[in-house]
């Protein structure tokens, strides 16, 4: 219970940009349970959160260590892969960074398409309903495949995408709860 509380507090701090506080919460949670996974649809390990907040604080060696650990536990964790790519790009390994960023963008795009199609009659319809995230991913993938790669733009947009994916889970859950409450006539789950 304590670990979940720390992760929730860390997520809230991270979303509003209080990265040092978020990092402290995530590191404490990782000490308690280094295998902790947050989320249901978009599952993320605690080391992904540690790595993202280290990245946001500009501590790239610590970010890389945590993100490598996250990906060794779950190689399909696209947000961790995105931030590993950003970390590599920020530390001078742009070729490898670009590979990781591109792979993560393709993974996020596939994941969003899977969720929104497979679960379109349930929770999937609440994920990226305005195609904002998928449009940004498509634009970044087009930029990567062109010969006109703007690194600053790619980094800025990738950071936005990472944060936006984090927020999207909360937005989808809130919208689903609101609709369920409306469908129940404001009674929640009461008969």
Identify the function of each model-found stretch:
Residues 111-191:
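Terminal, low-structured helical/coil segments at or just beyond the last alpha-helical repeat
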Residues 30, 78, 86-113, 138-146:
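TPR/TPR-like (Sel1-like) alpha-helical repeat modules
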């Amino acid at each position: 219970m304590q670990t979940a509380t720390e992760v929730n507090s860390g997520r809230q701090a991270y979303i509003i940009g209080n990265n040092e506080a978020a990092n402290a919460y995530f590191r404490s949670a990782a000490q308690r349970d280094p295998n902790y996974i947050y989320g249901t649809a978009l599952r993320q390990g605690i080391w992904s959160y540690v790595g993202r907040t280290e990245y946001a604080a500009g501590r790239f060696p610590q970010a890389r260590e945590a993100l490598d650990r996250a990906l060794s536990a779950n190689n399909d964790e696209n947000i961790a892969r995105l931030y590993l790519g950003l970390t590599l790009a920020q530390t001078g390994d742009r070729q490898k960074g670009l590979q990781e960023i591109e792979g993560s963008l393709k993974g996020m795009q596939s994941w969003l398409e899977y969720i929104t199609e497979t679960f379109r009659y349930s929770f999937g319809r609440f994920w990226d309903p305005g195609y904002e995230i998928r449009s940004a991913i498509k634009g970044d993938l087009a930029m990567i495949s062109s010969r006109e790669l703007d690194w600053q733009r790619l980094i800025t947009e990738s950071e936005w995408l990472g944060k936006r994916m984090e927020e999207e889970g909360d937005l989808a859950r809130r919208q689903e709860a609101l609709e369920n409450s409306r469908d129940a006539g404001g009674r929640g789950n009461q008969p």
